[in-house]
């Protein structure tokens, strides 16, 4: 059986979502790689991305009753992943939020199925954790329970303290976070594919400086 995490990273490279080189992160760090999930922006790539999410979610073992996608990136992720989960025999409802509340029609900030039971949040990455915190507030305000967070990539790097943004979410809320792939998987990709050999040492150095266990 192939490693879907490695397949996901190779797919991300093919879509130019994952790039190697010299980049500056929002935190001002010089990074040897860059991941931009916004470039999964056509039908086929979104379909394949949703398949990876569905597989990752199922293999995580997280128990959930529905999906929630925080605006804006999470909206399409929740809808597409719900369809792929349904193909795998897991048919669950999904919902998302608006950035601005509507005062007409159905109104409010929530769209889709009512938030009930155990709600799995789905997003592209966890950077500062702001989107997750806002999602948790929305879910709990509706009387539902956050079940965990599914993301595309865990960069596994320190935030302002010693913990990564993912670890901070896990610690603060006691929620499991299920990434399709992580920095460790990226490191394995570089080790096993000589054509990317020139980036192995820069990624190793970056992990040494900013990485978490």
UniProtKB/Swiss-Prot annotation:
Class of enzymatic activity (EC top level): transferase
What is the required cofactor set for this protein? Mg(2+)
Tell me the SUPFAM superfamilies matching this sequence: PRTase-like (SSF53271)
Q: What UniProt keywords are attached to this protein's entry? A: Glycosyltransferase, Magnesium, Pyrimidine biosynthesis, Transferase
- List GO molecular-function terms, semicolon-separated: magnesium ion binding; orotate phosphoribosyltransferase activity
Q: Which CDD domains match?
A: PRTases_typeI (cd06223)
**Where along this sequence does the record place binding of 5-phospho-alpha-D-ribose 1-diphosphate?**
26, 72-73, 98-99, 102, 104, 123-131
Q: Domain of life here?
A: Bacteria
Q: Which GO terms describe its cellular component?
A: cytoplasm
How does this protein assemble? Homodimer.
Role of this protein: Catalyzes the transfer of a ribosyl phosphate group from 5-phosphoribose 1-diphosphate to orotate, leading to the formation of orotidine monophosphate (OMP).
Q: What is this protein called?
A: Orotate phosphoribosyltransferase
Q: Which organism is it from?
A: Neisseria meningitidis serogroup B (strain ATCC BAA-335 / MC58)
């Amino acid at each position: 059986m192939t490693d879907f995490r490695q397949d996901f990273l190779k797919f991300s490279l093919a879509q130019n979502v994952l790039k190697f080189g010299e980049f500056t992160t929002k935190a001002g760090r010089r990074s040897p790689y860059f991941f931009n999930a916004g470039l999964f922006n056509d039908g086929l790539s979104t379909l394949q991305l949703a398949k990876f999410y569905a597989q990752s979610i199922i293999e995580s073992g997280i128990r959930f009753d529905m999906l929630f996608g925080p605006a804006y990136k999470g909206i399409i992720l929740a809808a597409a992943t719900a369809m792929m989960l349904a193909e795998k025999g897991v048919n669950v409802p999904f919902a998302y939020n608006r950035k601005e509340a509507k005062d007409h029609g159905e109104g409010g900030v929530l769209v889709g199925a009512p938030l009930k039971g155990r709600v799995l949040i789905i997003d592209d990455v966890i950077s500062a954790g702001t989107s997750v915190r806002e999602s948790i507030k929305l879910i709990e305000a509706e009387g539902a329970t956050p079940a965990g967070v599914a993301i595309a990539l865990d960069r596994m790097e320190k935030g302002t303290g010693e913990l990564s943004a993912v670890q901070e979410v896990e610690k603060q809320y006691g929620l499991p976070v299920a990434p399709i792939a992580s920095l460790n998987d990226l490191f394995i990709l570089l080790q096993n594919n000589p054509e990317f050999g020139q980036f192995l040492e820069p990624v190793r150095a970056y992990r040494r400086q900013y990485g978490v266990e």
